[in-house]
Amino acid sequence: MLSRRDFLQVSMAASSLYGASGFGNWAKLAAQQKLNQNQLLEFENFGNVSLIHVTDIHAQLKPIYFREPEVNLGVGDALGQVPHITGSDFRRLYGIDDGSPAHYALTHDDFIAMADGYGRVGGLDRVATVINSIRAERPDALLLDGGDTWHGSYTCYHTQGQDMVNVMNALKPDAMTFHWEFTLGSDRVSEIVENLPFAALGQNIFDAEWDEPAELFPPYKMFERGGSKIAVIGQAFPYMPIANPGWMFPEYSFGIRDSNMQDMVDEVRSLGAELVVVLSHNGFDVDKKMAGRVSGIDVILSGHTHDALPEPVLIGKTIIIASGSNGKFVSRVDLDVQNGRMMGYKHKLIPIFSDVISPDKAVANLIDQQRAPYIKELNEVIGKSESLLYRRGNFNGTWDDLICEALIEEREADISMSPGVRWGPSIVPGQDITREDIWNVTAMTYGKAYRTEFTGEFIHIILEDVADNLFNADPYYQQGGDMVRIGGMSYKIDINKPQGSRITDMTLLKTGEKIDPSKTYIVSGWASVNENTEGPQIWDVVENYIRRNEIISIEPSNNVKVAGI
């Protein structure tokens, strides 16, 4: 008789085969016009429970271009493991044909040519079509939002998240968890959450003063679907006050709190839960470690690190699902729950090809209503790009190279710094750069561009600190995101060295001189977590730079030399 783990491993193989026929092994297609919506949505119902997962939408209401990372390095046990495999290696692992839709959706190479053929991705009106299609087959499917939803665009900033709240309410989620939402400030978050028609979950959101669970955010919610009791436990981003300004939400503390997670799993099991789902914003590697430490979790729906995987990853008896970002994918998971336990599943990562999937008319109209008061500002053309502008990658992206150049020129600095965030769409060569495009990569509630003086020693400390957040071998010390971007300076990094000795050969580009630890340099940056930061907003800095230059031509930077890979 098969053990449950053996059964899940067999089920994993079935998921792989299903993913290959439904996603990864489409015939090579010259252009997206040869795809059709039925191919994207095709799914043979399985079991008695369906989950729908979206995460890290970052307020992208409309279709976009989005290039996946070229470099996404893993360290320690994550070395050479997904999601730390990219490009052709990723395609070989999953049996994805070169030139296929899956190639375009999941990997970075040949992006410009393939974007011309396959077009834009995402758009919440298209996401709505996918959700409605699944619900037509499974009316009681659970829709779960992994957070980073009310942040990341011009309209989201100016409405304090209300545009996204309105549109997501129309999609009718059953639960969500949180990260960037808290940068709206705790008062605004409370105002929204108190009026949500669905569960706002976070087992690790605590009252900072009393170190007790925060009343506004229940740890879990119980559902009955397909004749089975299901517990959904929320896991908000653990490192909120470190990665984001703690002064914006001083009432709350976070942390991984895996001991409390175990207590919650045990509690819901005692209440009769036959399926335990964790809706997580930990990041994929943190979720893998948590799955190995907390027993009794059946499914982790992973968010934060923006990974998109066409197959689940099995850790012990827990499957982990990664559903990408920016509205580019929707995951469907069908589960067979029998006699109080999960016996198997089928999974499909559905890419949202915007020219193939028809928009839901009601949601499309609702999106247009949110944008209408701002449409003139959104559509104003600031310049044109001759280059591919993208963000994702451990060390640099051309969007951030552009932002760093703007900071140096507009703020008259020696060195510039841009945060290694992973959100923000891409721009293809020949595309106009609108104000909306600029805000899509800069919009945040603490975006002032500071100009200050740092010693060479302090710059080194900053780089070492961020590098440890990214390349610490223990996932519980990783905060997600990528390396801080640097303009005006080059350096070498050995990702396998210990903290304090990873960063060497720091050089000021305009003189070719080594950075002097005792010398002071003028540094401009943005997204400081410090309260009362002064300076112009970063989107104004970038807009002024692009408007003045008109045509943007920028090649990927090679100013970071990477060792240890």
Label the model's feature ranges.
Residues N38-R120, L124-V130, A136, F249, ...:
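Catalytic centers of hydrolytic enzymes
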Residues M1-L2:
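Secretory targeting signals
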